[in-house]
Amino acid sequence: MTEISRPQPGEYSAFHARYVALVPEDDLLAAMQAQEAVTAAALGAYAATPDHSYAPGKWTVRQLLGHMTDVERVFGGRLLFIARGDPTRLPGFEQDDWMRAADFGRYALPDLLAEFGAVRRSHLSLLRWLPPGDWTRRGVVGDHDFTVRALARMMLGHERAHLDVLRERYDPVRPG
């Protein structure tokens, strides 16, 4: 296993610090791999009610999972640009605009879970192949510097943040 040391402040934005903080494990790749089953179980519990949301105007479970998959892809794309030494300043994105453009309601929840798992496994494969020197490469997203190792940790932290929201806000008002 390649040792992936923890990113330091300055390798990610203040906004993304919360995602980094949600990943205390030393073995990041093992944690990312193990999380797939946790996520599948947590979201799979809503198989009968994928259009449930915890309040009017809030995302449905199906939309939440679609968002998680979109962000996994975005973070992975940023990570690859930076790992390859591309000097392009990468754009941010507005999640609510993306949600309005997406049509996650047309997909069955099990299919969305399978898609998220496929994207995660693809990223794990990429991460396992990165040379050791790539982990500390820096790039710019929006107005902030990020390293490859920070983006990799943020992938898992973002997933965990949304599972926390699922437990705290969706579960207490889950139908039937």
Q: What is the role of each PLM region?
A:
Residues 14-30:
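Short, charged, low-complexity loops and linkers
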Residues 21-24, 97-112, 141-151:
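Acidic/His metal-coordination segments adjacent to aromatic residues that form catalytic metal sites
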Residues 30-45, 98-136:
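Acidic/histidine-rich alpha-helical segments that form the ligand environment
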Residues 1-18, 50-95, 121-124, 132, ...:
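Short, contiguous alpha-helical
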Residues 25-26, 41-58:
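Generic structural signal for short, solvent-exposed loop/turn connectors between secondary structure elements
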Residues 24, 35-40, 72, 159:
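A general secondary-structure boundary signal
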